[in-house]
Amino acid sequence: MSAQPAYFAPAGLGLLSVAQAVPQWIGVRQRFEQFHRNIALTELQYQDGVTKRASVVACLNRSYYGTSSPSDNSFLVGSWWENTAIRPPRDVDLYFVLPISVYHRFQSYQWNRQSALLQEVKAALAATYPDTDMSGDGQVVVVRFRSYAVEVVPAFLLQSGQHWICDTHNGGSYKQTDLWAEIRHIDAVDQANGSNIRPLSALRAGVFRSKF
């Protein structure tokens, strides 16, 4: 039995050989990799994002834990965790895990505890960045630096490893998220597809930005 792929061409052209097909796919991959390099963050842009994240996290650690750690009690989410951030830089998304004592303190509030919590986190950041535009609504506190917006999701760690995050809409509530399950799923899909899923996600985002 022939080892050639069963790609049938019009009469007279015969089967498409592996030797013909492979160079075409090599070219596609090379163009894909070059496009990905062209839209990936530059080293300067990447370091700027890292610095902004570290500064915001250090500020919140001082307020809630009495330390100045630039990374403790936080983790990246979104395109920065997925390694799909592209230029031009837009935002850095992160979870900041608050002490459980903060949750119990806000439980004494009668109205929209979640909104009050976001405003407290915003005020803690405003003390360090008084001239920077900020907002706190929905699930995030947004710190709008000139080059990046850092979007902070205040969260509480549950015994299950999941998190509660704020939702200020409709009177306020907590939403349960399972980021680690999502992370494991993305890792599995990426590995099963030759580590191409994350670059494809970045490519898709680049095409989307070019249209809007």
What are these regions (language model features)?
Residues 44, 54-57, 122, 130-131, ...:
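Catalytic cores of NTP-dependent nucleotidyl/adenyl transfer enzymes across multiple folds
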Residues 95, 111-114:
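Acidic/His-rich structured neighborhood in mature extracellular/periplasmic domains
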